[in-house]
Amino acid sequence: MNHACDLLVIGAGPAGLAAAATAAKLGVKVTLLDEQAAPGGQIHRAIEARTIKPGVALEDEERGAALVREFRNCGVHYLPGTQAWQLEPDLRVYVSDGDKAACIQAQRVIIATGAMERAVPFAGWTLPGVMTVGAAQIRLKTATWIPPANTWLAGNGPLLWLYAAQLIEAGGGIRSEEHTSELQS
């Protein structure tokens, strides 16, 4: 896997896919890697493999599918299931794919790894049915799972609002939503 490229993009979510496809169209030799097995990131997880039940087409499905199709057709060297674990000042990037390690020498690097959900423990957080919004969104996108209509959403950050909109669009109901993002000094 040791090789060189003009641009290495780390992360195959919407930003990474768009950056890689745009650069490739401009003639740049691009390599894109992501730890997941398929492109799309959290927001378009499993978009190529997903079968959505009739009436459960999420608004951004077609945009996500089009972005992945564009990426697949632009000639980018794609390394799925690969983790970057070290970036040197001279832009050597050390990566692992299963039990194999390698080095990629890049002229430029774009880090487009997206946001990370951080679960905050609270009383009852390990009870059945209690999950993070990221886990609930994965279930909606990969299994078309819609929780019961008496679902409560609580937390902060933009993923909560996105999931609430996707859940309603998919025919789900929300009993209550609590957004807690007060800034404190």
What are these regions (language model features)?
Residues 4, 10-32, 116-178:
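Rossmann-like dinucleotide/flavin-binding elements
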Residues 13, 26, 82-87, 181:
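Hydrophobic/basic alpha-helical segments enriched in Actinobacteria
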Residues 36-59, 117-129:
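Conserved N-terminal glycine-rich FAD pyrophosphate-binding loop of Rossmann-like flavoproteins
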Residues 47, 114, 183:
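Flexible loop residues that form catalytic
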Residues 51-69, 159, 181:
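Short beta-strand to alpha-helix junction loop
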Residues 178-185:
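Conserved small/polar residues in nucleotide/adenosyl-binding loops
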